[in-house]
């Protein structure tokens, strides 16, 4: 290679790349050592753009081993990328990523393909192929790009067809994990006015993760992508581009790499707050653990022998193995991952004459996704269930042949369907678990999977489509004034988005409890539907349009002012609900939601349901206030803009200062009971962004520097409440520095470096409960595990009375045990509060109980004598703590990267060894911070050596990534209390190495 050049753009000091420019600009006369970008929607030298932008052309992507999005983030300062829990991903720029979780959330980082915005794209899943360039813009970009993005824009530019002549290339690669990859393209001119380009890739490899349960490999890849493009130039000044792209993946990709837990022996929390460890949560703390316990069954007057266990006894994960290796698991559920994406684009660019240009473009996108994975990444101990399964078989059998009653004197017809669905071969045979089907009938409708171990897994699926149209008129006058004006209109439609959690224990509870509920209310044999958790967005429609423009005023050859403005209008309507054991469903039903006993189901707790209950006669949605779905509409309209002043000190040195105001629309939270005090909606977020920068060339050294300060209002943050992701708003301050240096001592030797510093903090008071510690570090509090739903609440003393609050909980539990609470039977035998183990990170005590009864007792329902001196408060969502001053997630304090290569001439050949070193500092995985939420710093070293033939017509390459095989964590997710408070972690890929050969024609 004849010299290396910088790749970082602007002030934002990005990453360094090699000399090249986008193919769209190929007709222009430019220095071959310059990068041409379209950051301001026109072709400009990278070093002339007063925006924080980084660009990677095809050669840079290859040399720096940037094969996918995870690789891309390593080469950029103040940028991180991580997969997230629900099939999504978060690209974080300067501390701001997709901290909002939900179908109505907009992305903080806008992803564009050829300048067109994408929604829920799977570009993050696949491999990069036949790209002309990737441009990364930092900071709000609403006055130039599509939909709003408060953190920035990543614009993937595909290689366009060339009318200059026929061309083709092919590359074949083989690596460890039996990885086989192929990619290539062919370009064919069609006369003098058109050309066609077809490109594609294919990747197949074995899994990264060993499953010791059955000695198999999981987390493999089997994917391909294909793209066809047409360029037509019918006459001078007219360019028409058409493109269609398809991506498909079907394999056993895992959405998470590891699940971690410091096991809680008390069962109140499941996992403790002291550290992340290679243990498994205590199953007694889960929704299944409490609702199938002898203690809960006792409060309902059900036979203790039918309970799957005791909250104080051996739990279903006793003996479960969680290997202390990020690439080794023990799971009895094979993950599945199936996704496809269509993208169709068209644009026409017309020179209008007189220095004016018009560009009109449209984009259509369709995404389907279906993924399933073991929910707890562990194997349950079925021996714990043995007694209950034998009892179920007893209840399902007639006392004597032909007798309609069982040995307990109850009708067999109510229990036989449960046993037939879940233990078809008897209590010692296969155990069957519901499949997550839309009908909601699960195993009781014949939709089941059966195995020797109790299953628990989740499923995430979605179907969405979107389209957008954009028009831009820009000027290129010779005088001191130019402008750009444009508009965009887009529609997004989500027709299905569901998250399911399925477990044998849920099936058992919904079958057994449903049988007794139906029997006691005179209903026919029934189960509780749905026999799995389903958070379902049935329909989401988003309509948005924006009008934007910029004016460029040159006061002199050196001084230029840019002023931009944008009007934003967003409308969102969502139809959603969650179901889990919500209503009786008669056996034999083909659609659980068509039950005749669903009148008491209420999908919208914000309205008052006159007849709450799981067995009310009537169809779902037939009673006023008891809605079948929560339906909400929100609308937002805002003005944003920017101002930039740049000054060219010399032709090789520029400084600039900018102010921009960014906006991201608000949205709608899923339906939750009012007791959790979560707003139906969340507000838009705004950022006032200030930036100064300098771009400099000093002969063979290039130095770019940037400083920035962000003032955020109503930044959107997600947390889990009652098994559901909800979003809050906080204020935040962010500031940082970025530097990048490129040194070319000779034309053969090139060195690039970049470094960044980032400070983030919540800047205003915001009180939220930490899901890992509902007692908020208080010794005068008791954390409660509610045996009626698996949630946690907390009881806190109003006067610091430690003994008093513990005595209060013990007294209320004794009242429950005695059967003195209306609607509850005696015999629960709930125990007194107990301390958590040493090193747990929990100062409070813990106990099993019933939060609703504790709230009533605190209000005097059982007399003033129960309430201790000073009084107590019951916190349904935990005791809130002030998160002011806490760091934002996914924002490392420091990042550093350096690369060196030497292109050694060998006659007609060139041998180029290269090495890259990357350091990413520590960050936090969620807003509550602390050691347990820390994402450790990590380093990665990559290396390769490439031999290029004459005129680079062929090459052979040997490469290695992650040389030292680091288990680098990029993000984490803390689950709900009813699931056990475990932590899912996401990592970079392990060490990979291989060889590749390629040819150009």
Feature roles, as predicted:
Residues 760, 918-926, 947-1001:
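C-terminal beta-signal and adjacent terminal beta-strands/loops
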Residues 215, 221-483, 490-493, 702-704:
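Outer-membrane beta-barrel domain signature, strongest for Gram-negative TonB-dependent receptors
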Residues 709-711, 728-927, 996-1000:
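Gram-negative outer-membrane beta-barrel transporters
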Residues 64, 106-108, 120, 129-138, ...:
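Outer-membrane beta-barrel translocator/receptor signature
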Residues 51-99, 109-128, 133-142, 159:
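Periplasmic N-terminal accessory/gating domains of Gram-negative outer-membrane beta-barrel systems
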Residues 349-353, 357-363, 370-373, 498, ...:
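Membrane-embedded beta-barrel scaffold of Gram-negative outer-membrane proteins
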Residues 233, 473-476, 482-492, 538-710:
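Structural signature of Gram-negative outer-membrane beta-barrels, strongest in the C-terminal barrel
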Residues 1-64, 70-76, 344, 999:
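N-terminal Sec signal peptide and the immediately downstream disordered periplasmic leader
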């Amino acid at each position: 290679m004849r010299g290396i050049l910088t790749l970082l753009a602007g002030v934002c000091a990005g990453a360094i790349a090699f000399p090249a420019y986008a193919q769209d600009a190929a007709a222009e006369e430019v220095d071959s050592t310059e990068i041409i970008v379209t950051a301001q929607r026109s072709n400009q030298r990278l070093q002339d753009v007063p925006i924080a932008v980084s660009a990677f052309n095809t050669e840079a992507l290859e040399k720096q081993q940037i094969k996918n999005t995870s690789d891309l983030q390593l080469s950029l300062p103040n940028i991180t990328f991580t997969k997230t829990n629900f099939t999504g991903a978060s690209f974080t720029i300067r501390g701001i990523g997709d901290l909002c979780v939900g179908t109505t959330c907009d992305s903080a980082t806008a992803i564009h393909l050829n300048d067109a915005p994408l929604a829920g794209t799977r570009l993050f899943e696949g491999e990069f192929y036949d790209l002309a360039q990737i441009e990364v813009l930092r900071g709000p970009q609403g006055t130039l790009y599509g939909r709003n993005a408060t953190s920035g824009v990543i614009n993937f530019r595909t290689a366009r067809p060339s009318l200059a002549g026929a061309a083709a290339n092919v590359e074949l690669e083989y690596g460890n994990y039996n990885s086989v990859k192929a990619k290539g393209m062919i370009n064919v001119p069609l006369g003098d006015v058109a050309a066609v380009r077809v490109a594609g890739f294919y990747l197949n490899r074995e899994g990264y993760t060993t499953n010791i349960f059955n000695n198999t490999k999981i987390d493999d890849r089997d994917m391909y992508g294909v793209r066809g493009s047409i360029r037509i130039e019918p006459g001078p000044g007219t360019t028409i581009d058409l493109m269609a792209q398809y991506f498909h993946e079907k394999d056993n990709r895992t959405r998470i790499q590891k699940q971690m837990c410091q096991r809680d022996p008390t069962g109140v929390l499941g996992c403790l707050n002291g550290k992340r460890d290679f243990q498994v949560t205590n199953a007694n703390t889960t929704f299944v653990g409490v609702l199938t316990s002898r203690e809960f069954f006792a409060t309902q007057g059900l036979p203790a022998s039918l309970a799957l266990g005791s909250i104080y006894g051996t739990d279903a994960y006793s003996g479960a193995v969680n290997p202390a290796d990020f690439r080794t698991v023990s799971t009895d559920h094979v993950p599945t991952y199936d996704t496809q994406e269509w993208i169709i684009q068209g644009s026409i660019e017309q020179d209008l004459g007189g220095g004016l240009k018009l560009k009109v473009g449209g984009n259509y996108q369709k995404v389907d996704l279906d993924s399933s994975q073991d929910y707890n990444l562990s194997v349950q101990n079925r021996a714990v269930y043995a007694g209950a399964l034998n009892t179920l078989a007893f209840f399902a059998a007639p006392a004597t042949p032909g007798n309609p009653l069982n040995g307990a004197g109850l009708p067999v017809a109510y229990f036989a369907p449960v046993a037939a669905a879940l233990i078809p071969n008897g209590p010692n045979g296969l155990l069957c678990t519901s499949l997550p089907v839309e009908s909601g009938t699960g195993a009781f409708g014949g939709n089941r999977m059966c195995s020797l171990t109790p299953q628990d897994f989740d499923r995430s699926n979605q179907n969405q489509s979107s389209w957008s149209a954009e028009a831009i008129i820009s000027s290129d006058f010779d005088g001191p004034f130019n402008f750009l004006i444009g508009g965009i209109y887009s529609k997004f439609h989500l027709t299905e988005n569901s998250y399911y959690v399925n477990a044998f224990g849920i099936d058992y509870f919904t079958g057994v409890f449903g049988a007794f509920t139906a029997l006691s209310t005179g209903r026919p044999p029934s189960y509780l539907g749905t026999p799995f958790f389903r958070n379902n967005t049935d329909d989401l429609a988003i309509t948005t349009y924006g009008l934007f423009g910029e004016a460029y005023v040159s006061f002199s050859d050196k001084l230029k002012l840019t002023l931009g403005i944008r009007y934003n209008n967003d409308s969102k309507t969502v139809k959603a609900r969650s179901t889990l054991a919500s209503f009786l469903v008669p056996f034999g039903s083909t659609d659980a939601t068509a039950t005749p006993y669903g009148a008491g189901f209420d999908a919208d707790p914000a309205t008052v349901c006159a007849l709450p209950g799981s067995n009310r006669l009537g169809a779902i949605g037939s009673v006023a206030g008891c809605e079948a779905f929560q339906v909400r509409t929100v609308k937002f309209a805002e003005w944003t803009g920017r101002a930039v002043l740049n000054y060219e000190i010399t032709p090789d040195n520029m400084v600039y200062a900018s102010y921009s105001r960014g906006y991201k629309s608000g949205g709608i939270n899923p339906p939750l009971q009012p007791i959790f005090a979560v707003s139906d909606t969340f507000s838009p977020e705004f950022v006032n962004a200030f930036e100064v920068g300098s771009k400099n060339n000093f002969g063979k050294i290039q130095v770019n520097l940037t400083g920035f300060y962000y003032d955020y209002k109503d930044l959107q943050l997600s947390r889990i409440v009652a098994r559901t992701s909800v979003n809050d708003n906080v204020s935040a301050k962010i500031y940082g520095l970025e530097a990048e240096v490129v040194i070319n001592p000779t034309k053969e030797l090139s060195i690039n470096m970049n470094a960044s510093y980032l400070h983030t903090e919540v800047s205003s008071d915001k009180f939220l409960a930490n899901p890992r510690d509902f007692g908020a570090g208080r010794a005068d509090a008791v954390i409660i595990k509610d045996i009626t739903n698996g949630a946690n609440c907390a009881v806190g003393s109003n006067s610091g009375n430690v003994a008093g609050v513990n005595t209060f909980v013990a007294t209320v539990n004794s009242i429950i045990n005695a059967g003195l609470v209306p609607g509850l039977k005696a015999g629960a035998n709930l125990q007194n509060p107990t301390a958590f183990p040493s090193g747990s990170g929990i100062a409070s005590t813990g106990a099993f109980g019933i939060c609703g009864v504790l709230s009533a007792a605190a209000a005097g329902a059982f007399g003033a004598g129960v309430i201790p001196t000073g009084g107590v408060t019951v916190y349904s969502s935990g005791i809130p703590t002030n998160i002011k001053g806490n760091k934002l997630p996914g924002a490392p304090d420091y990042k550093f990267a350096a690369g060196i290569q030497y292109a050694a001439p060998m006659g007609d050949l060139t041998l180029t060894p290269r090495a890259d070193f990357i350091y990413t500092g520590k960050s936090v995985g969620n807003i509550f911070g602390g050691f347990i939420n820390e994402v450790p710093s990590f380093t990665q070293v990559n290396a390769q050596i490439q031999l290029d033939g004459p005129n680079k017509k062929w090459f052979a390459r040997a490469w290695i990534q992650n040389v030292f095989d680091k288990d680098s964590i990029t993000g984490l997710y803390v689950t709900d209390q009813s699931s056990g408070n475990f932590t899912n972690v996401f990592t970079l890929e392990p060490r990979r190495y291989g060889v590749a050969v390629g040819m150009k024609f």
